């Protein structure tokens, strides 16, 4: 019996260049292509949480400031969060299409040059 899907969860510590929205967009776009998956909509990258005071941006929740990015897939989604005050990146790749988590790890390592990490690979809906 084939499972419903696969989740790869990667938490990266001491990662580099985490506040670059364009880099995050290109990272997700390239990752989707490397996994031979198809987008179901537009990639979204949001910088936050931010508020404005006297017309200038100020960070809210200082230790959680970063990017939130989402790539909707025909087969599910890729979600990434960065917390640049802590040099932390967390990535979730969920898809009902089978894929190689090592490819995700290697490309993320190449792009964000992290030092330490934690990872989990979960088979979802085993009795689907």
Question: Where in the sequence are the language-model features?
Answer:
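Polybasic/polar functional segments that serve as interface/processing modules
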Residues: 1-128
